[in-house]
Amino acid sequence: MNKQRRKELSKIACDLANATTKEQIEDFINDIENLKFEEEMFYDNAPENLQYSRRYMESEDSINYMDDALDYLNNALECEGDDFKNNINNAIEELRRAAI
């Protein structure tokens, strides 16, 4: 993952901690999906000499972490109260992992 996407994911993770409405969550979902798409484009179009390199494997991990975060956020849309907040917190952790 490049520096710019890492920075954007870190910002989303910080901002997500203050999310209180489902509309805000939907906006974050869209932002994460866009970043995930960009990372998938890098991953899918990596030159052969980069495939299976450390950066390539980290990209795959980041995509998986973003997928997990999106699952938690979609679950949050279905929940309220503590379950809502727990899903948000889990998504934040996954985004932090993706941004490493």
Which residues make up each language-model segment?
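Feature detects long, helix-prone N-terminal segments enriched in hydrophobes
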Residues: 1-100
